[in-house]
Amino acid sequence: MNRTLLVIIFSLFVSACSSTSGFSIPEVAQPAPKIQFENLHLRGVFNWWEATSAYQFKKDSNGWYVNVELIADGQPYDFRLSDAIWTPSQSCGGNYKGQPVMVSTKIFLVCKQGSENLQFTPSNTGIYRFQIAPADDNEVSLVITR
């Protein structure tokens, strides 16, 4: 009898140690990393998607900019913004693939893994300025001017 009681108590102790409770500690959402504008490059078909100094954003009083010479041949240029190593939180693009960008129209880019390429089709051959600035919720505003 004592032996049976001992086995029952031991079994209860072992099963209590291996069971999980219904309580779990919630995970705290980490804030999105801040966009490092000084490290961003304009990357697209016009520069073979490379991060070169000619396409690195420069600071001015209106934010950050890059001037690019584009040929108006009726074909869209795919592009996006990213640092030199395509860090997901530092790669900015559209909400959907091929999102169009128009001259002098502000759009907001998302900076996260899964952002998509943007498209710009110049109406005239010439130099275009890609101007970016910080926006809300880890977004970047973009305006292309001529």
Q: What are the language-model segments listed below?
A:
Residues 2-8:
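Sec-dependent signal peptide recognition
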Residues 13-16:
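C-terminal motif of bacterial Sec signal peptides marking the signal peptidase cleavage site
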Residues 18-21:
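Bacterial signal peptide processing site
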Residues 32-74, 84-110:
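Aromatic-rich carbohydrate-binding modules that target alpha-glucans
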Residues 38-42, 141-146:
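Extended low-complexity, serine/threonine- and proline-enriched intrinsically disordered segments
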Residues 75-77, 128:
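Exposed beta-strand face motif in extracellular beta-rich ectodomains
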Residues 82-84, 135:
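Beta-strand-rich extracellular modules
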Residues 119-145:
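Short, exposed beta-strand-loop hairpins at the edges of beta-sheets
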